[in-house]
């Protein structure tokens, strides 16, 4: 086959990797919905979902069928175009972010020199989905939830970006693979512990997970910016939240825990194990912590996270300058 050149083979393999990684991300998010309910039941001393299939393992199938057969209703007072576009933007921006995460030395869709900046670009686009959903719904609770979510996301993205500048300075690159390679001897969680803590807090806030789920506070805003959504559109927002959990967990593994590096086990196993630990931590937070007031969340970000990231960046820069070779 004369047309099957090395360039075509490389493109085909990249497309194959993209499909596998995206399906794995969505599948992991769907599985996480059931795992979370089972773990919450265990930690809260009650039964989780245990009626569909043996030990409730088919609960995911039941939930998917329920969402598919729900009426996909659009309110007559909604802005139809933006209302339909919002969940698509939310899901697409999250899935595209997986393109720059290296799973193993040989697996990863796009080896971009600005991989970290690409992630922040996708995170910024995700804010538009929230704003479109709240504004187009024509509902005051949806609009209030969208305003909360956009302000919280934009604020904590600032701290998230600053917390990673120390990692970028130590690795000397925005390329995800080069950042992982720089952690072969020492994971960045050790020299960048304060940056890791800030990134963890910011990641929880950006994904709107408990205890930072003020944009969706059921007691105050009746489910926030997706109150008017139903059927598959609501399902895209719902699954998107869990895709965000997997994404932030994978990023923390890549940037602070050495990615696929580890002894004895294959690289893919190390990456999945580390990611699973952070996913479990996300779930544990929901069971363990109460929801603070919205003003307390914003104050914590600007009064604690921002100074901490700036101090971490200043100290990191000073240490690199002091210990760098002369003339380097």
Curated annotation (Swiss-Prot):
Its EC number is 7.1.1.-. It is an enzyme of class 7 (translocase). The keyword Transmembrane applies. The chain crosses the membrane at residues 8-28, 81-101, 114-134, 154-174, 186-206, 237-257, 265-285, 304-324. Keywords: Cell inner membrane, Cell membrane, Membrane, NAD, Quinone, Translocase, Transmembrane, Transmembrane helix, Ubiquinone. The keyword Electron transport does not apply. Pfam families: NADHdh. GO terms for molecular function: NADH dehydrogenase activity; oxidoreductase activity, acting on NAD(P)H, quinone or similar compound as acceptor; quinone binding. It is a multi-pass membrane protein. It is found in: Cell inner membrane. It catalyses: a quinone + NADH + 5 H(+)(in) = a quinol + NAD(+) + 4 H(+)(out). GO terms for biological process: aerobic respiration. GO terms for cellular component: plasma membrane. NCBIfam families: PRK06076.1-1, PRK06076.1-2. NDH-1 is composed of 14 different subunits. Subunits NuoA, H, J, K, L, M, N constitute the membrane sector of the complex. PANTHER family: NADH DEHYDROGENASE SUBUNIT 1, NADH-UBIQUINONE OXIDOREDUCTASE CHAIN 1. NDH-1 shuttles electrons from NADH, via FMN and iron-sulfur (Fe-S) centers, to quinones in the respiratory chain. The immediate electron acceptor for the enzyme in this species is believed to be ubiquinone. Couples the redox reaction to proton translocation (for every two electrons transferred, four hydrogen ions are translocated across the cytoplasmic membrane), and thus conserves the redox energy in a proton gradient. This subunit may bind ubiquinone. Belongs to the complex I subunit 1 family. This is NADH-quinone oxidoreductase subunit H. It comes from Chromohalobacter salexigens (strain ATCC BAA-138 / DSM 3043 / CIP 106854 / NCIMB 13768 / 1H11). The gene is nuoH.
């Amino acid at each position: 086959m004369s047309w099957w050149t090395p360039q075509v083979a490389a493109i085909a393999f990249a497309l194959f990797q993209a499909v596998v990684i995206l399906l794995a991300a969505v599948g992991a998010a769907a599985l996480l919905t059931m795992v979370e309910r089972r773990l919450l039941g265990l930690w809260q001393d009650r039964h989780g979902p245990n009626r569909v299939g043996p030990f409730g393992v088919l609960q995911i199938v039941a939930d998917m069928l329920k969402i598919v057969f729900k009426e996909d209703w659009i309110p007559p007072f909604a802005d139809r175009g933006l209302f339909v576009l919002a969940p698509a933007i939310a899901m697409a921006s999250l899935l595209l972010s997986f393109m720059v995460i290296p799973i193993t030395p040989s697996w990863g869709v796009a080896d971009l020199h600005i991989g970290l900046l690409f992630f922040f670009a996708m995170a910024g686009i995700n804010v538009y989905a929230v704003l479109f959903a709240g504004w187009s719904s024509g509902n005051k609770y949806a609009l209030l939830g969208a305003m909360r979510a956009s302000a919280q996301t934009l604020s904590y993205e600032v701290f998230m970006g600053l917390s990673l500048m120390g990692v970028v300075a130590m690795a000397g690159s925005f390329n995800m693979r080069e950042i992982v390679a720089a952690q072969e001897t020492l994971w960045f969680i050790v020299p960048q512990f304060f940056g890791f803590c800030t990134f963890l807090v910011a990641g929880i806030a950006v994904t709107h997970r408990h205890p930072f789920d003020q944009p969706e506070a059921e007691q105050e805003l009746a489910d926030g910016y997706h109150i008017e959504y139903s059927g598959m559109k609501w399902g895209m927002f719902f699954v998107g939240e869990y895709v965000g959990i997997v994404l932030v967990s994978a990023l923390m593994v890549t940037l602070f825990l050495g990615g696929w590096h580890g002894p004895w086990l294959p690289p893919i196993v190390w990456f999945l194990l580390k990611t699973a630990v952070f996913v479990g931590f996300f779930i544990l937070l929901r069971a363990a912590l109460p929801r603070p007031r919205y003003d307390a969340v914003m104050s914590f970000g600007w009064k604690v996270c921002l100074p901490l990231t700036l101090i971490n960046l200043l100290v990191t820069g000073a240490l690199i300058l002091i210990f760098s070779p002369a003339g380097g």
